[in-house]
Curated annotation (Swiss-Prot):
Residues 150-206 form the BTB domain. InterPro entries: BTB_BTBDG, BTBD16, BTBD16_C, SKP1/BTB/POZ_sf. The gene is Btbd16. CDD domains: BACK_BTBD16. PANTHER family: BTB/POZ DOMAIN-CONTAINING PROTEIN 16, BTB_POZ DOMAIN-CONTAINING PROTEIN 16. SUPFAM superfamilies: POZ domain. This is BTB/POZ domain-containing protein 16. It comes from the Eukaryota.
């Protein structure tokens, strides 16, 4: 049964200026209707329009009148018009600067309207002062004191001072150390120009030590441009850069999950990606560790857990199961690597049995990966990080007895090409990582479905290049042994080149 409130909305008496007037307490306007009417007369604004959104209307009018060439002419001299009480300090401000901040403008207009007796006279004085450029000395306007309470711990006095300084100057330098505080200050002040400037600064300063805080700031303020940039940057740098530093510990789990699911993710191999993710888990469980351990130390740690069940089926490992479901364990084909995975008792036995069975069937059928259908989500991934000092760079990979060389070539200062080529096992110098315990296929041809992609950062924007998905038979004799080449023109460096392929049934 619905209860009805029989109590009618009462009007309350409030003294505004020298009069005694009625108003509804639920009214959206912070003063009263007569005061609003007075302001509309001064500003030459239609009262009906003002009633729809009085705060926004008044602020926009003042902004239009006050934000002129003062921003380009340096700081303003003269006596302050407004005293801002905030963070235990009293900050002296001027009208043209106040109206760049919606928060300060609302506080100021509220205080001005509620000030005793002279709301209309003060408005007329302010408008008169700023309407004539020839006027060198302003008429005295009574100083208004406004207060702003800030509870955000990110806003320090130094950061807030920098934010207020940006009201007066276009070029105020921000560092990585204070940009988050200035961003928080700009958000509270509703100072859009400064907020965009902070975001731009953060976009250009993504590093292993800033990625966490910048991403969380993007989430906090719902700034999609910043969160997307963090995701793209980490997708490229998780394995080659962040995974080699202690900052890996601070990557938030939601961000890590998004990156692992990203089709743009760069990795040297599936096993490199697995090692990076294992290291992240190790660092979550060993908070006092200040440097990355060697690989053997990490393996010994996971091997020390009870053998009654695997790590991912125990606490806290179970909570990280979604992360490891993103991996393509079928892309790890080295017997040594698979034995290592089995030894640490990290994954459910059913996962390892399925991977081993798929490898067995692929070897038995000459390399056919009948269990893989979708190149974009199931392909085996390999990568080259082409650095500035390289003119040619290549790596050799072995899968089910087939050997391929993935290669990048620099043709001139801005021209590059990336390709893959099938090679004979007899052409190898047999580095242990490729030849040791490898099977050798005697098949003269191998059907391969592949795609080559390259990405690089230029002026804060990612350039992306790629071939289509290509189906090709690889033999040993040119030109049949070589893939299509991905040719690109870019000034970006380094270049992240990714090779994805599967062996369809043939």
């Amino acid at each position: 049964m619905k209860m009805l409130n029989s109590r009618k909305i009462r009007m309350e008496r409030r003294i505004v200026g020298a009069t005694n007037r009625w108003r509804f307490p639920q009214d959206h306007f912070c003063g009263d209707l007569l005061a609003l009417s007075q302001m509309c007369n001064v500003l030459n604004v239609d009262l009906d329009d003002a009633l729809k959104n009085p705060d926004k209307l008044c602020i926009s009018k003042f902004q239009k009148l006050f934000t002129e060439s003062i921003m380009d002419s340096g700081t303003q001299s003269g006596e302050a018009d407004v005293i801002l009480d905030c963070l235990g300090f009293k900050w002296e401000l001027h009208h043209p600067q106040i109206f760049q901040s919606e928060t300060l403008a609302k506080l100021y207009l509220t205080a001005l309207i509620q000030n005793t007796k002279s709301s209309q006279r003060d408005l007329e004085k302010i408008l008169k002062v700023h309407s004539t450029e020839r006027m060198k000395k302003r008429s005295p306007v009574k100083k208004i004191i406004i207060s702003l309470r800030i509870n955000d711990p990110a806003v320090t006095r130094v950061a807030f001072a920098l934010a207020l300084k940006n009201l007066y100057m276009n070029e105020v330098e921000m560092t990585v150390d204070n940009v988050l505080g200035v961003l928080a200050s700009a958000h509270i002040l509703q100072f859009n120009r400064l907020f965009r400037k902070c975001v731009s600064t953060m976009l250009n300063r993504l590093t292993p030590c800033t990625i966490k805080n910048f991403y969380l700031a993007g989430c906090k303020y719902k700034e999609e441009q910043l969160t997307n940039a963090c995701e793209k940057w980490l997708a490229m740098n998780l394995v080659p850069l962040v995974g080699t530093q202690i900052h890996l510990r601070h990557i938030p789990e939601p961000l890590l999950y998004k990156v692992l699911k990203s089709p743009r993710l760069f990795t040297f191999s599936e096993f490199h990606l697995l090692k990076t993710l294992l290291m992240w888990v190790y660092l979550q469980m060993n908070g006092k560790v200040q440097t990355l351990p060697i690989h053997e130390t990490m393996l010994a740690f996971f091997s020390s857990f009870p053998k009654k069940s695997c790590f991912l089926e125990q606490d806290p490992g179970h909570s990280w199961m979604p992360l490891f479901l993103c991996l393509r364990l079928h892309g790890i084909t080295s017997g040594k690597d698979l034995e290592e995975i089995k030894h640490i008792n990290f994954f459910p036995e059913s996962w390892l049995v399925r991977v081993t069975a798929n490898h067995y069937h692929a070897l038995e059928s000459g390399g056919n990966m009948v269990h893989l259908k979708d190149l974009s989500t199931q392909a085996m991934r390999f990568g080259l990080l082409f650095r500035q000092e390289y003119t040619t760079y290549s790596e050799t990979i072995s899968i089910y007895g087939y050997f391929f060389e993935i290669k990048g070539i620099k043709h001139d200062t801005t021209s590059y090409s990336f390709s893959m080529q099938r090679i004979r096992h007899t052409d190898l110098e047999c580095p242990s990582s490729v030849c040791e315990h490898s099977t050798i296929s005697l098949r003269s041809e191998r059907l391969v479905k592949y795609e080559i992609r390259a990405q690089t950062l230029v002026d804060g924007r990612w350039q992306e290049f790629g071939t289509n998905q290509i189906m090709q038979k690889f033999g040993f004799i040119k030109p049949g042994c070589k893939s299509h080449a991905l040719k690109i023109q870019t000034v970006g460096i380094p270049i992240y080149a990714s090779f994805a392929f599967i062996f369809p049934a043939s």
